[in-house]
Amino acid sequence: MAALQLYIPFSTGPCLSNCRFRSSPVRSSSERQALFNRIAPVYDNLNDLLSLGQHRIWKRMTVSWSGAKMGDSVLDLCCGSGDIAFLLSEKVESNGKVIGLDFSKEQLSVASSRQKLKSKACFMNIEWVEGDALDLPFSNGHFDAITMGYGLRNVVDKHTAMREILRVLKAGSRVSILDFNKSTNPVTSSFQELMIDNVVVPVASGFGLEEDYKYLKRSIKEFLTGEELEKLALDVGFSSARYYEIGGGLMGNLVATR
Ligand SMILES: C/C(=C\Cc1cc(O)c2ccccc2c1O)CCC[C@H](C)CCC[C@H](C)CCCC(C)C
Ligand SMILES: C[S@@+](CC[C@H](N)C(=O)[O-])C[C@H]1O[C@@H](n2cnc3c(N)ncnc32)[C@H](O)[C@@H]1O
């Protein structure tokens, strides 16, 4: 039987949440793009609520480990609604330049609205680019630092994403990648699953986004451990790679130097 794709009006992709006929998990790039478009209106508030504001600390650590400094030209990959790009902007100041890249129009629209509401002059140094992390529209060796928050786990081809990051980084520069930690400690991974099943998904279901947040647990299961992420970075050609567990082991950060 031919594959049946259901579309809901005004959505950018197939019907995934609240859809009785939903059959496959969020596998393709366009399904993931549709998911992030759908959750954009509530994404920031849910992150604050679900992490009790802790994600702000993890994002600050990510920026600090990227080595970004005043005057730098930096890239925030999979920038979503812009949290990390705004932090980078304060770091590189008005004579620096920040590019926030994402493939979700809705997330970028939230980022751009937030930028307009901010009063600090440095925030004018941010440019939002709609693009694909797997095919970056930048020349080789362009950036002094790159950050990526909760992005690598969500791209369909992690190897290509890391190769693209390496390509657009200057020699000696760093990428700092924040994400959920796929822990090898059974106590930590059970606690993470417990939080997702009993807090994250029930809260999200109150916004009609149960299926979209269920994807989170599957994506962590299919992600790489810290050791595997270090290996991936070295395999694609980074000269060094170090993984740090943070947030009590729930989160992790990969720092790799070109
Ligand atoms: C930062 C959070 C979520 C980001 C996020 C990432 C994704 O890839 C998604 C994909 C699809 C849908 C949504 C998302 C998404 O929102 C929130 C993280 C919340 C944690 C699961 C729970 C944190 C629990 C504690 C309150 C933290 C305690 C820390 C302490 C130091 C032990
Ligand atoms: C969980 S959000 C993280 C947003 C933000 N970095 C943060 O930390 O809050 C993941 C983001 O990755 C983006 N994304 C996933 N795959 C992508 C790809 N191939 N190219 C560009 N953006 C992508 C999604 O659109 C989404 O905005």
Q: What is each PLM-predicted segment?
A:
Residues F103, D157, F180:
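Short beta->alpha hinge that forms the Motif I/post-I loop of the SAM-binding pocket
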Residues Y43, I146-T147:
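Hydrophobic beta-strand segment of the Class I
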Residues V236-R258:
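Core SAM-dependent methyltransferase catalytic element
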Residues H159-R174:
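A short glycine-rich, Lys/Arg-flanked "PGG" loop and its adjoining helix->strand segment in the class I
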Residues A2-D44:
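N-terminal, positively charged/glycine-rich alpha-helical extensions of SAM-dependent methyltransferases
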Residues S30, K120-C122, L178-V236, R242:
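C-terminal alpha-helical "lid/dimerization" subdomain adjacent to the S-adenosyl-L-methionine
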Residues L52-S73, D83, L87:
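Conserved alpha-helix/loop element of class I SAM-dependent methyltransferases that forms part
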Residues S73-L136:
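Class I SAM-dependent methyltransferase SAM/SAH-binding core
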